[in-house]
Amino acid sequence: MPVIAVVDYEMGNLHSVCKGLEKAGATPNVTYSPKELEQADAIVLPGVGAFDPAVQHLRARGLEQPIKDAIASGKPFLGICLGLQILFESSAEGTQPGLGIIKGKVRRFRPEPDITIPHMGWNQLEMTQAKSILWEHLPSDPWVYFVHSYYVDPIDPLIRAATITHGTQTVTAAIAHENLMAVQFHPEKSSNIGLQILSNFVAQVREKIPA
């Protein structure tokens, strides 16, 4: 089974992500060792919490460059929730620079009379990259689970893989470009749809492993 490094940088419970990856047919390895990131077949960067502590913890553990190197090498990479946001250059939530792997900013939802912030609960994805490997074997407009007050705004619209609409605001819910994929929602909390998305990622990892 492919070994997937789940990056541990003290930002949230990793247990449910690991359980999801196991169900999808992978062997998760929770780690903050740059060497183990290099040896793994793929990397998952999960995370819940605030932007500034997240990037501070990553940098304190010396993980910024190993993550950038892994992505540049073509290793399959999946960011989840905060693990999507910190790939960007900056966030309205904090003052720390993000990893800057993706050009663009993290913005806060504008208040509207009939919406709650954080955006919390189930919402429907609208696919903007219909052929992305993440969406294989999914129904159209699938429901997935969100908990967030901020969303990513990439400069290049072509990397946007899906959007959601909250009130009158349509925002990026997932990005995908070559081996780099990341989602704002929680696949590990999104029932069978989420498991299929994780399985699609694991299938791509398996394809890249030399026979």
UniProtKB/Swiss-Prot annotation:
Major localisation: cytoplasm
Residue span, Glutamine amidotransferase type-1 domain: 3-211
Localization of this protein: Cytoplasm
EC number: 4.3.2.10, 3.5.1.2
Biological or metabolic pathway of the protein: Amino-acid biosynthesis; L-histidine biosynthesis; L-histidine from 5-phospho-alpha-D-ribose 1-diphosphate: step 5/9
Molecular function via GO: glutaminase activity; imidazoleglycerol-phosphate synthase activity; lyase activity
Keywords in alphabetical order: Amino-acid biosynthesis, Cytoplasm, Glutamine amidotransferase, Histidine biosynthesis, Hydrolase, Lyase
GO biological process terms on file: L-histidine biosynthetic process
Active site, renumbered: C81 (nucleophile), H186, E188
PROSITE patterns: GATASE_TYPE_1 (PS51273)
GO cellular component, one term: cytoplasm
Pfam families: GATase (PF00117)
Catalytic reactions of this protein: 5-[(5-phospho-1-deoxy-D-ribulos-1-ylimino)methylamino]-1-(5-phospho-beta-D-ribosyl)imidazole-4-carboxamide + L-glutamine = D-erythro-1-(imidazol-4-yl)glycerol 3-phosphate + 5-amino-1-(5-phospho-beta-D-ribosyl)imidazole-4-carboxamide + L-glutamate + H(+); L-glutamine + H2O = L-glutamate + NH4(+)
Domain of life: Bacteria
Signal sequence region: none
Chain's role: IGPS catalyzes the conversion of PRFAR and glutamine to IGP, AICAR and glutamate. The HisH subunit catalyzes the hydrolysis of glutamine to glutamate and ammonia as part of the synthesis of IGP and AICAR. The resulting ammonia molecule is channeled to the active site of HisF.
Assembly behavior: Heterodimer of HisH and HisF.
Protein name: Imidazole glycerol phosphate synthase subunit HisH
Taxonomic lineage of the native organism: Bacteria, Bacillati, Cyanobacteriota, Cyanophyceae, Nostocales
